[in-house]
Amino acid sequence: ALMADGVAPADVYEVLATPEGVDRAFKKLDTIKQDIVWWDAGAQPPQLLASKEVVMTTAWNGRIQNAIDKDGAPFKIVWNNQILEYDMIAIPKGAKNPELAYKYLAYISQPEINAKLASYITYGPVRIDAASFVAPDALPKLPNAPDHMTAYLVADTEFWGDYGEDLVKRFNAWLAQ
């Protein structure tokens, strides 16, 4: 909402950390509330687009790219002002085979191996230096392709840890209005 209201991606969390920023975000959401179609499963965005129930949506890029590549859907992904989220892998404290887990992490962290993910789904490799190992035809389909990294927001887990509970309460109250 804040980016739609003119806040630069780099400034979103600084603005959203203030009461005025939260009010600004919800004021922007108010302008589109009656037009929003909410989804709660990853398969829904391509279905909503295909049925023409919506003309644009947020989505996991892999779902949209799959609809384009496999189903011939006439969709276009817009990368400008995208929100990037990263998954994490952890070794639980007290794991029975931590040495094996460390070997696994070392293996998948190699740029050449990390880049292979793009052969199976269009979620980009997490290592920047892996991009040079991605097939040239796959690279433009990845959210973290160099050409797509000019205007983006990285989801800030620390911010959401600090402010998420209050923002979710405010959001749920807003939805109920």
Task: Describe the predicted segments one by one.
Residues 1-76:
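Ligand-binding pocket segment of bilobal, Venus flytrap-like solute-binding proteins
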Residues 20-27, 31, 40, 44, ...:
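Extracytoplasmic/secreted proteins, especially bacterial periplasmic and envelope-associated proteins
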